């Protein structure tokens, strides 16, 4: 009998220990949900009501012809930042451009008299990383920041060979669907930010520092990953950022949800809250430039937003040409072959 009581007591202790362990795990699990929606709401209110660069900031790109004209007629009013690697910069760059690593761009701009320039032009290989950088700079209050459309690929063929010309493709034409859009997610909550700040400008500053330090790599995703998400170890909420008529006419990635630009879908009053907060949101446009710019805005708010590299040009290029879709990369008209220095 004593032995039985001892056994029961032992079992009870084991059960109690197990219960406490589970309780401890549950408590630990709650801690992984760091940050708060309130922080995000403070930042969102600021970006929508006081510094709405994303919806009201105008075009974020400048074409090579306009940049060249500005450099010839008013060179002192242009400040060009080239974020390509030092090695590629040395092989050729726009005269007067400063070579700055992506992670250092924000601090670099802080150290110049930014408001004395008409334009702060950010340049990269293809216009995608530069569009992302410009989105962050405009959020910081540098409304004169702008991205060179198509990057150095538009300046001379030498640069396009290893960038845009190398990434045009039509391999996904047969896989593209021409069905109506699936429904958007039901509206949920904002992501949680954990800067520890309570003031909008301080929260924004913390987010800017984090995103510039991370660089563009976490934003990039290829069509190979989107079509074979299992291979990349991810599941994606795919956002097609096109007008509805082109969503069906040109076709779309199967399962992609149409967020038409005309609806300003990334406002809190429209469809912002339908984006996923549990996984990655992959945005794609025609070129990868608008989706990169948009990803900058969404990542500031804590969304895991990613941009599909080179957009539809990398997937259904021939169909884009056939349908004369805007922002199709046409080498004969988009590559200017301007002079450069090395």
Please report, for each region that a protein language model flagged, where it lies by residue:
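A short acidic-Thr-Gly-centered motif at the start of a beta-strand
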Residues: 68-76, 227-233
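Rhodanese-like catalytic fold shared by cysteine-dependent sulfurtransferases
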Residues: 25-62, 90-119, 128-221, 245-280, ...
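Bacterial N-terminal signal peptides
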Residues: 12-21
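Short hydrophobic beta-strand that contains or immediately precedes a catalytic carboxylate
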Residues: 67, 79-84, 97-100, 237-240, ...
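Short, surface-exposed ligand- or partner-binding patches at beta-edge/loop junctions that are enriched
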Residues: 123-124, 284
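Bacterial N-terminal signal peptides that target proteins for export
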Residues: 2-12
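Structural motif
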Residues: 79, 119-121, 237, 280
């Amino acid at each position: 009998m004593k032995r039985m009581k001892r056994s029961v007591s032992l079992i009870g202790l084991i059960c109690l220990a197990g219960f406490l362990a589970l309780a401890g795990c549950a408590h630990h699990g709650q801690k992984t949900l760091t940050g708060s929606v309130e922080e995000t709401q403070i930042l969102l209110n600021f970006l929508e009501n006081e510094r709405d660069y994303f919806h009201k900031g105008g075009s974020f790109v400048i074409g090579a012809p306009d940049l060249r004209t500005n450099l010839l007629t008013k060179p002192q009013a242009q400040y060009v930042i080239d974020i390509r690697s030092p090695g590629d910069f040395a092989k050729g760059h726009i005269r007067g451009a400063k070579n700055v690593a992506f992670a250092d761009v924000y601090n670099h701009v802080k150290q110049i008299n930014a408001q004395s320039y008409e334009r702060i032009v950010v340049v990269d290989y293809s216009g995608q990383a530069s569009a992302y950088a410009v989105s962050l700079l405009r959020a910081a209050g540098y409304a004169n920041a702008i991205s060179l459309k198509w990057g150095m690929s538009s300046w001379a063929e030498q640069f396009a060979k290893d960038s845009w010309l190398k990434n045009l493709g039509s391999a996904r034409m047969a896989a593209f669907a021409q069905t109506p859009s699936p429904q958007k997610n039901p509206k949920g909550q904002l992501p949680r930010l954990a800067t520890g700040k309570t003031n909008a400008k301080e929260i924004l500053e913390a987010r800017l520092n984090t995103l510039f330090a991370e660089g563009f790599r976490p934003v990039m995703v290829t069509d190979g990953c989107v079509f074979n998400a299992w291979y990349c170890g991810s599941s994606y909420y795919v956002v097609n950022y096109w007008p509805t008529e082109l969503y069906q006419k040109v076709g779309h990635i199967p399962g992609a949800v149409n967020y038409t630009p005309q609806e300003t879908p990334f406002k809190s009053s429209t469809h912002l809250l339908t984006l996923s907060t549990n996984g990655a949101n992959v945005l794609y446009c025609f070129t990868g430039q608008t989706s990169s710019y948009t990803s900058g805005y969404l990542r500031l708010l804590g969304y895991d937003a990613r941009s599909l590299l080179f957009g539809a040009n990398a997937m259904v290029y021939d169909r884009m040409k056939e349908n004369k879709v805007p922002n199709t990369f046409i080498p004969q008209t988009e590559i200017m072959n301007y002079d450069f220095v090395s």
